Amino acid sequence: MKTLVICSGGLDSVSLAHITSQKYQLTRLVSFDYGQRHRKELDFARAAATRLGVPFHLIDMRSIGGALSGSALTDDIDVPDGHYAEDTMRITVVPNRNAIMLAIGFGVAAAQGDEAVATAVHGGDHFIYPDCRPGFTRAFETMQRAALDGYADVRLHTPFVEQSKADIVRAGAAHNTPFAETWSCYKGGDIHCGRCGTCVERREAFHLAEVADPTVYADPDYWSAAIAGREAE
């Protein structure tokens, strides 16, 4: 299956790229610059494409991202600290982001003769991000089949949609994903902050997967307090 992978440069999508390269025919990685404050993630996506020997397509969505206002990822709004499932994390939603990116991905796949678009949405995303849930991915694939009817047959591949981030860590480790060469932190500093929702989720995933975490965090211990606080609610 000739598969295009939507790759942010994060742990999930880079793991998916490595898994896809071994299980299917990885054709290309597609990334998006939508004006995110953690734009450095794109360097990790580019490095993954180089490592895996496939073309890297960087789509400039900055003008679109500028119109999708109100998110801590694109506006001058502080990224909150805490557990990834807390309501405060809703400020990190970029409206319709995945739908827009997937639509472009399907267009690229159709133009290039690919058979599938793979995205690393997973169970941990369901709390906050509606365009990561199974209902959305099923509906989106139906829409795309109608949009490309008679022109191209491209499927949506979402192997992690019902899995946890810990499951992704285990699968990534089994396929030799270099986790140190991935970026998750939404704050986009020199190193992972260890306090934002994505850092907490990343640290917890390695712990639950019982896989060594090579990540350097500015606050390496905060995650456990965030998890404990959530469980106490």
Curated annotation (Swiss-Prot):
Give any Pfam family that matches.
QueC
Pathway field of the UniProt record reads: Purine metabolism; 7-cyano-7-deazaguanine biosynthesis
**Could you say which residues bind Zn(2+) here?**
C185, C193, C196, C199
Give the cofactor note text: Binds 1 zinc ion per subunit.
What domain of life does the native source organism fall in? Answer: Bacteria
Q: Which UniProt keywords apply?
A: ATP-binding, Ligase, Metal-binding, Nucleotide-binding, Queuosine biosynthesis, Zinc
Say which enzyme class the record assigns: ligase
Question: What's one GO BP annotation on this UniProt entry?
Answer: queuosine biosynthetic process
The protein's required cofactor(s) are namely: Zn(2+)
Q: What does this protein do?
A: Catalyzes the ATP-dependent conversion of 7-carboxy-7-deazaguanine (CDG) to 7-cyano-7-deazaguanine (preQ(0)).
Would you tell me the protein name for this molecule? 7-cyano-7-deazaguanine synthase
Report the source organism: Ruegeria sp. (strain TM1040) (Silicibacter sp.)
- Taxonomic lineage of the native organism: Bacteria, Pseudomonadati, Pseudomonadota, Alphaproteobacteria, Rhodobacterales
Give the gene symbol.
queC
